[in-house]
A protein has these predicted regions:
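Histidine-centered active-site loop/cap adjacent to the catalytic His
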Residues: 250-272
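Active-site segments of SGNH/GDSL-like serine hydrolases
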Residues: 179-212
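Substrate-gating cap/lid alpha-helix
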Residues: 200-235
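Oxyanion-hole/transition-state-stabilizing segment in secreted/luminal serine hydrolases
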Residues: 118-167
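Surface-exposed cleft-lining segments at the edges of enzyme active sites
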Residues: 107-112, 154-172, 204-209
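N-terminal secretory targeting modules
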Residues: 1-65
Length: 272
């Protein structure tokens, strides 16, 4: 009798232990399949970087770094303002915030391959860009227009002058893609404004066809920029076409003061 009672106790204990194990296992599976919000199993929701990246609204001051070619340097403007200083002045008025131009890193004649190399190797370049919350950029014109400019320098113009522009497009766009990728790696939170290209030779019959290639450039550049939440493109094509004499300087390539003023106004419209 005692032996039977002992076996009954052991059997009851085993059943209880098994039930406890099954309940625990069931709870574990439930937690794995249906975790509640307070548990570590729920990953943090991603930040809305697409809408907030590059926003200047919450900044106490605007810190500008400009880079690129002679257009950003302001070549052709006899006042020395270019578009960069005019953008800064306009932002002071529209935002009522202090606006500082930290650096203008533009270099006359700079090409996409040269800028890509600087961004990749020049730590001083990268350091300056990291301090900005607004980056202004022009690049690509020297790559595409060098053939036409050479032929325009005291030589007879011909339709062949624009053939080089079309041939340069693919390689220049590839380098442009590298540039904006590197810019994003250096500073993913700053608003980056790329100023689109225009055809400075629109009023010359033999070179007017270049407008078609310039439009291709602008469209493809926009497509590349669209991949980054903090980058925008400001078109300038329509600002000069048909108005070359009014808004280009004597070199027939760079804007004059009023031309840069129109570019600055377009940039301000895109930022406000």
């Amino acid at each position: 009798m005692k032996t039977n009672g002992l076996w009954r106790c052991l059997a009851a204990a085993s059943l209880c232990a098994t039930a406890i194990l099954l309940i625990g296992f069931g709870c574990t599976v439930k937690d794995m399949l249906f975790p509640y919000r307070g548990q570590v199993a729920i990953a943090a929701e991603p930040k809305a970087v697409w809408t907030e990246a590059g926003s200047l609204e919450k900044t106490s001051e605007i810190r500008v770094v400009a880079l690129g070619d002679s257009l950003t340097k302001g070549t052709g403007d006899n006042t020395g303002d270019g578009y960069v200083k005019q953008v800064a002045a306009g932002l002071r008025k529209t935002t009522n915030k202090p606006v500082k131009i930290l650096n203008n890193l533009a270099i006359n004649g700079l090409r996409t391959d040269q800028l890509a190399e600087r961004l990749d190797r020049d730590k001083g370049f990268a350091y300056a860009l990291q301090k900005a919350n607004l980056i202004l950029l022009t690049i690509g014109g020297n790559d595409l227009f060098h053939t036409a400019r050479a032929r325009n320098a005291g030589r007879k113009l011909s339709a062949y002058s624009m053939e080089g522009l079309s041939k340069e497009l693919p390689a220049t766009l590839e380098r442009f893609g590298r540039i904006i990728k590197e810019l994003y790696a250096i500073n993913s939170s700053a608003k980056i404004v790329y100023v689109g290209l225009y055809n400075p030779f629109y009023d010359i019959k033999e070179l007017r066809s270049g407008s078609l290639e310039v439009q291709q450039w602008n469209e493809k550049a926009y497509t590349l920029l669209h991949n980054y939440p903090n980058m925008i493109m400001v078109p300038t094509f329509d600002l000069f076409e048909g108005k070359i004499a009014d808004y280009l300087s004597d070199d027939h390539f760079h804007p004059n003061h009023n031309g840069y003023k129109r570019v600055a106004s377009r940039i301000l419209d895109s930022l406000n």
